[in-house]
Amino acid sequence: NVWRFPYLCQKNGGGAYLVPYLVLLIIIGIPLFFLELAVGQRIRRGSIGVWHYVCPRLGGIGFSSCIVCLFVGLYYNVIIGWSIFYFFKSFQYPLPWSECPVSRNGTVAVVEAECEKSSATTYFWYREALDISNSISESGGLNWKMTLCLLVAWRIVGMAVVKGIQSSGKVMYFSSLFPYVVLACFLVRGLLLRGAIDGILHMFTPKLDKMLDPQVWRDAATQIF
């Protein structure tokens, strides 16, 4: 949510996106959240057992929700792997994605043409982090750096599952407060950049015509769930 919400806000009309988001949050998001808490506290069963208790024929809903959670876990753990990769790369100075790579041909320094046409961050993302092939017909080799980061991410998940819910309670104070510290650092850094005020005005200036676009409401509903 932290990295996706600003992107959706900028994509879907800035401040105008907050209107469908808040409407759907009040009408759908918060009621479903409290309904889930109430049902779980009253019946005291898991996702599958709750629906089987309500009606045995509805047990498939519980299985479906577990499958959805599985796919969501696979999707987000890849993002965690990317984050781990960038975490270790960020200890370098200068940052590897701050400048285009330069190759030397004798005494002549040549900037990578592909990077020069796009940007240093885009080049690093596609060529260093993802290590994608030149075309879809080429499968490419194993990206061992990203594979190791993904294994580390799944190792963390495995340790959390084995230790149980009590282990997560021990780090709850850190995990709940540290993201806000990081966001505060990002806020200060963003405000110190050149053109920060123009960017903020562009992001939060409402584009009311966007509210008539069904895709905006769809993105808002997806963000809530």
Curated annotation (Swiss-Prot):
Topology Extracellular: residue spans: 81-143
TM region(s), chain numbering: 1-8, 16-35, 60-80, 144-162, 171-188, 224-225
Reactions accelerated catalytically: L-proline(in) + Na(+)(in) = L-proline(out) + Na(+)(out); L-leucine(in) + Na(+)(in) = L-leucine(out) + Na(+)(out); glycine(in) + Na(+)(in) = glycine(out) + Na(+)(out); L-alanine(in) + Na(+)(in) = L-alanine(out) + Na(+)(out)
GO cellular component: cell projection; membrane; postsynapse; synaptic vesicle; synaptic vesicle membrane
SUPFAM superfamilies assigned: SNF-like (SSF161070)
Topological relation to the membrane, as annotated: Multi-pass membrane protein
Annotated keywords: Amino-acid transport, Cell projection, Cytoplasmic vesicle, Glycoprotein, Ion transport, Membrane, Neurotransmitter transport, Sodium, Sodium transport, Symport, Synapse, Transmembrane, Transmembrane helix, Transport
Subcellular location: Cytoplasmic vesicle, Secretory vesicle, Synaptic vesicle membrane; Postsynapse; Presynapse
Hydrolase found in the keyword field: no
Top-rank lineage group of the source organism: Eukaryota
Glycosylated sites: 105
PROSITE patterns noted in UniProt: NA_NEUROTRAN_SYMP_1, NA_NEUROTRAN_SYMP_2, NA_NEUROTRAN_SYMP_3
GO biological process, one term: neurotransmitter transport
GO molecular function annotations of the record: symporter activity
Main location: membrane
Family: Belongs to the sodium:neurotransmitter symporter (SNF) (TC 2.A.22) family.
Function: Synaptic vesicle transporter with apparent selectivity for neutral amino acids. The transport is sodium-coupled but chloride-independent, likely driven by the proton electrochemical gradient generated by vacuolar H(+)-ATPase in an overall electrogenic mechanism. May contribute to the synaptic uptake of neurotransmitter precursors in a process coupled in part to vesicle exocytosis.
Descriptive protein name: Sodium-dependent neutral amino acid transporter SLC6A17
Natural source organism: Bos taurus (Bovine)
Species classification: Eukaryota, Metazoa, Chordata, Craniata, Vertebrata
